[in-house]
Amino acid sequence: MGKPDHHSFPSDMKTHATPNCDILGAPIGTPDHCDEWVMNKAIRKATKLMPHLVKLDAPHHACLLLRYCLSFSRMVFYLRAIPVDCLPSACDRFDQAVLQGLQSITYYKFDDNAIIQSSLRLANGGLGLRKSKLHHPAAYYASFRQSKDLICGFTSSLNWNNMPHFASARTKLSEAIPDFKDEDSPTQRDLSARTDLLQKSDCSTRLMVRNKARSNAVSAPREVQFSRAFLRQRLAMDSRQMN
C-alpha cells in the first residue's frame, strides 16, 4: 500500500503516513502489523478464556467449547483474509494456546502422535482442533480462488501467478498436498480435508498397532473416547510404574 502524498491534504490537517490500517475487521499492511493485530484480536482474548475450561469440571463439555468457540473457528476469518506470509508467529502462538487448553482439560501431556491426532477432523478420528498454521495456505488460497470471478468483474484480466500472495499460498499448499493441481476443487473444505488425510496417513505410519486401532475406532459420534482411551492408557502406564 502506498503512502499518501502530504500535498493532497490541507496544510492545516495533521497526517500520519503509514502503510498499515485495518478494514472490515482485518489488517492490511506489513507482516509485523498483521501479526501483532491478530495476536491482539484473537490470541490474547482466547488465552484469557482458556483457563476457565478447567473450572467446568467436565472434560467432554470443555472439549466441545474448546473446539467450537476457542480453536480454529476463532482464526479462520483471519486465515482467509490475511496472506500466508503475514502471520509469521501469530499462528504458532494460537496453536500452542489451543494445545495448552486441551492438556489442561485432560491433565496429561500428549505425545507427538496424540497432538497430531487431536488436530485431525472428527471423521478422521481426531478432535477437530485444526492447526491454524497448517491450514492457512488452504484457507487463503480458497478465499482468493472463490473471489476470482468477482475481482475480474471489476478489473481487466489478471495474471494470478504474478500476484505474490496468491503464488505463495499456492506454493505452500503444494508442499502440504504434493499431488495438488490447479484444476482440483478450490474450496477450503476439500483442501483442508485432503490435508487432514495426509496428516492421518503420516501419523499412522508411526503408530503401534494398539494406538492405530484406537485412532481408527474414534469417529464423530464417539469423539470423547479419544480422551478416555488416552487417559486409560496413561493410567495403566502409571499403575505399572508404581508396581
PLM features: residue spans?
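Non-catalytic, peripheral interaction segments enriched in hydrophobic/basic residues
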Residues: M1-G2, N20-F154
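Short, conserved micro-motifs composed of acidic
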Residues: M1-P19
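Charged boundary/loop elements
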Residues: I82-V84, A138-N243
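Glycine-centered secondary-structure boundary/capping sites
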Residues: S8, D12-K14, G25, Q103-Y107, ...
